[in-house]
C-alpha cells in the first residue's frame, strides 16, 4: 500500500475548514451504507476514487471488496487528518492514496497516475455549488466506459434545518440529476429513489419541527430496526419517491 498525502497540490486550492461532526453521525449507519454499496457494486470497477471521503467510514466498506486501488479525496483539513491516519492503518489491505483537496484541483493528476475506472460521490455532490462543473471534471478524468457513482438527498421540499447546517446547496430530483449527468457526457445506467420510509420522518423532524442536528442514537435505531426491512421492500418494488437518489452513469 502507498499512502500519499499531496500537500503540495492543495496550496493552490482554497483551504476548507469543516469538522464534519453532524455528517459523521451517519458513520453509525452501517446497514445503510452497506445497502448503498451493494447497489453500486455490480457496476464498480477495480480502480476507485472516493470524493468527499470524510473520515473514511464508507471507504472502509469499499476496501472490504478488495479493489486494485483506492484514492480518497477530502478537502476539509480536520476530516482529512483523521482520514489519512486511517488510510495508513489500512496498509496491508490495498493500494490506498489520499488527497487533501477538492477533486477538480487533482483530477488530472489522479487520472494520469491512478487511472480510475470508478469515481464515487456519497452525500457529497449536494455540497458543491457548481455541481455541473464537478461532473464535467469527473467525466474528463475517466476513460471511455468509466463510471460515476452518485448518492444524494432528494426533493427540495425536504430541505430543512439539517441541510442548512451542513451546507447543502440543494436536494435533487431524479430527472434533474439525470439531466446534469447527461449534459456532462454520461449515459445513465441506473437511477432510483432510495429509502422511501425515511421521507415522512425526515419531513416531520427537519421541516415541520425544524430540528437541525442528527442524533447518533436515532441513526443507530433506524439503521438496525428499519433499514433491513426497507431494503427488502425496495428490492421487490422500486419506490416512487425516496429520501435519497442513487445513480450510476457511464462515460460514453
Give the location of each predicted region.
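Short, glycine-/aromatic-enriched active-site segment of Class I SAM-dependent methyltransferases
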Residues: 21, 148-170, 174-182, 204
Amino acid at each position: 500500500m502507498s499512502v500519499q498525502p499531496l500537500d503540495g497540490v492543495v496550496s493552490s486550492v482554497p483551504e476548507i475548514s469543516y469538522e464534519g461532526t453532524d455528517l459523521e453521525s451517519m458513520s453509525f449507519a452501517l446497514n445503510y451504507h452497506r445497502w448503498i454499496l451493494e447497489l453500486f457494486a455490480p457496476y464498480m470497477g477495480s480502480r476507485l476514487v472516493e470524493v468527499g471521503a470524510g473520515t473514511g467510514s464508507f471507504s472502509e466498506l469499499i476496501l472490504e471488496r478488495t479493489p486494485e486501488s483506492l484514492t480518497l479525496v477530502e478537502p476539509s483539513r480536520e476530516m482529512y487528518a483523521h482520514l489519512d491516519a486511517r488510510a495508513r492503518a489500512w496498509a496491508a489491505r490495498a493500494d490506498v492514496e489520499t488527497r487533501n483537496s477538492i477533486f477538480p484541483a487533482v483530477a488530472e493528476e489522479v487520472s494520469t497516475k491512478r487511472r480510475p475506472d470508478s469515481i464515487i460521490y456519497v452525500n457529497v455532490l449536494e455540497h458543491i455549488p457548481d455541481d455541473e462543473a464537478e461532473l464535467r471534471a469527473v467525466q474528463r478524468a475517466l476513460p471511455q466506459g468509466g463510471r460515476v457513482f452518485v448518492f444524494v438527498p432528494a426533493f427540495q421540499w425536504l430541505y430543512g434545518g439539517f441541510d442548512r447546517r451542513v451546507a447543502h446547496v440543494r436536494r435533487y430530483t431524479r430527472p434533474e440529476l439525470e439531466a446534469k449527468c447527461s449534459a456532462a457526457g454520461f449515459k445513465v445506467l441506473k437511477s432510483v429513489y432510495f429509502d422511501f420510509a425515511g421521507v415522512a420522518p425526515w419531513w416531520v423532524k427537519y421541516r415541520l419541527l425544524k430540528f437541525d442536528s442528527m442524533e447518533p442514537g436515532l441513526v443507530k435505531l433506524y439503521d438496525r430496526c428499519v433499514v433491513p426491512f426497507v431494503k427488502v421492500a425496495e428490492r421487490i418494488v422500486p419506490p416512487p419517491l425516496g429520501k435519497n437518489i442513487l445513480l450510476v452513469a457511464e462515460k460514453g
